[in-house]
Amino acid sequence: MIEKFPSKGTSVLVTKDMCDLNNHMNVVYYQHIFEDGCHNFYQEMGFSNDYFNDGFSSFTLESNIRYLKELVEGEKGTPYFRLIKINPKLIHYAGIIVDEAGNVSSFSEHVLAHVDMNVRKTSEMPDDLIASLNSMLEEHNSTGPIDFDLRLSIK
């Protein structure tokens, strides 16, 4: 499964304060792992500090998370990401959180909008960024189809 999500994020060790009354990691921390763990993936997509300093960013328009296997205190969760589809203004990507045994704990999908921060509106990505993302998408697609039904989509 991991091979179909080629961008590895930052691992997180589940601590007692992350657990709820059910003695497993509370759902809010799954989002936290996906959010904090995607920085390398965003860099790989071209959303570097320089790009942001040039006045461009991305806003999340929609997210969907599925909880498949609980993580408990002392376990480590590692996020992995891949592109699903792009168009001139939008990016659809997915992620998984995997435990140390290789079990998928959670699956997420996200739709991002490319934003011109000078006007704070969705804008088309520059041609070089689209070309880079298309190359990345081709590489990710070469790993095979993902094993989850997608709930989000872009045209």
State each model region's role.
Residues 11-14, 66, 111:
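Generic structural detector for well-ordered beta-strands
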Residues 8, 59-61, 77, 91, ...:
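Hydrophobic core residues within well-ordered beta-strands of beta-rich domains
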Residues 106-108, 124:
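A structural microfeature
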